[in-house]
């Protein structure tokens, strides 16, 4: 074995899982291991899995199988790791299996099979912000783990546990390190961002703590107010529509955090929402959306929905289409209901046939596409702040405040010299054209 052991790493799943991968990679680098992006020459391979839906489980199992075939020494972690028996039935030769956010256990297993190397102070230095898998100009910041909801289509609590919020000072310290390292955009993630600190006692929630000499309370609003002082873009994801979310909108209107709200509404039929164990009155939701836009006209609303949930009738589905038309959401994701092993909804009666799910999915997307086209057309002629993600011989590709990386649209700018700008720079672009999802503009 060479002086510095090589660890191969595969990261699957959502941004929350990506943050877990970054934490493990940071621990590996701190311990002196070399991280490589291939099976060849790796002394061990770690696979951080996803287990949210059956297709993700299959992808994870295939990734583990490939790692075993190409390398032979594999440690499995992540959401699917919570189902050890399921993994070992398919891949009995896996060395060790841990559940999600089991950083210490993963490192113990690595040390067991690949002893920790002697540290060289000149080669094993880890940047203050840790190892990041995202481009240097943006990063995901996870503020809590787990979830207290018991949605019938979801098994996240069984894999990641109940809500466990990080201390606010710890979050803010990490955010400042990231900003100091050059990060221009922080994407705040968790299973339920708006529930931040609600798992703590009222005494702890109301307790005054100090950060940078400023007294703050332990809640989401205070967290956002302090993140705003960093002078970078702050984007909120996975914001469950609790009443106190209304208090975030003035911060967006004042330019303290991005006017972008990612709220997973899931459906519009009261019957289906009840079956999903999701709260909320659609009439009240529409009223709140109207109020939010009155306070913050530039607000971008993103949401996700499920079609073909067990018991969904044509009438239920039509309610969803009517809601889309009335709500005029900016960015929307749609998923066909997928059975998940262990989820209550998987065993429900009145399962919707696959061909019906497919047909409803396409109808849903047609309605939302028309809405998206109309809303993006309204941006033509406006000048928007754009953060640059890529620069090539054709121009630049960036994102506006309305666009999160990977899941939303982009802005193309071609009348600009490569030497005039840098990746991560925020520039002003005048929009000249739009299609269903993307914008074009001039600098």
UniProtKB/Swiss-Prot annotation:
Keywords: 4Fe-4S, Cytoplasm, Iron, Iron-sulfur, Metal-binding, S-adenosyl-L-methionine, Transferase. CDD domains: Radical_SAM. GO terms for biological process: tRNA modification. Its main location: cytoplasm. It is an enzyme of class 2 (transferase). Residues 133-374 form the Radical SAM core domain. Gene3D superfamilies: Methylthiotransferase, N-terminal domain, Nucleic acid-binding proteins, tm_1862 like domain. Residues 377-443 form the TRAM domain. Disulfide bonds: none annotated. GO terms for molecular function: 4 iron, 4 sulfur cluster binding; aspartic acid methylthiotransferase activity; metal ion binding; protein methylthiotransferase activity. [4Fe-4S] cluster 2 binds at residues 147, 151, 154. Binds 2 [4Fe-4S] clusters. One cluster is coordinated with 3 cysteines and an exchangeable S-adenosyl-L-methionine. PROSITE patterns: MTTASE_N, MTTASE_RADICAL, RADICAL_SAM, TRAM. It is found in: Cytoplasm. Its EC number is 2.8.4.4. InterPro entries: Elp3/MiaA/NifB-like_rSAM, Methylthiotransferase, Methylthiotransferase_CS, Methylthiotransferase_N, Methylthiotransferase_N_sf, NA-bd_OB-fold, Ribosomal_uS12_MeSTrfase_RimO, rSAM. Its cofactor is [4Fe-4S] cluster. Catalyzes the methylthiolation of an aspartic acid residue of ribosomal protein uS12. This is Ribosomal protein uS12 methylthiotransferase RimO. It comes from Haemophilus ducreyi (strain 35000HP / ATCC 700724). The lineage of its organism: Bacteria, Pseudomonadati, Pseudomonadota, Gammaproteobacteria, Pasteurellales.
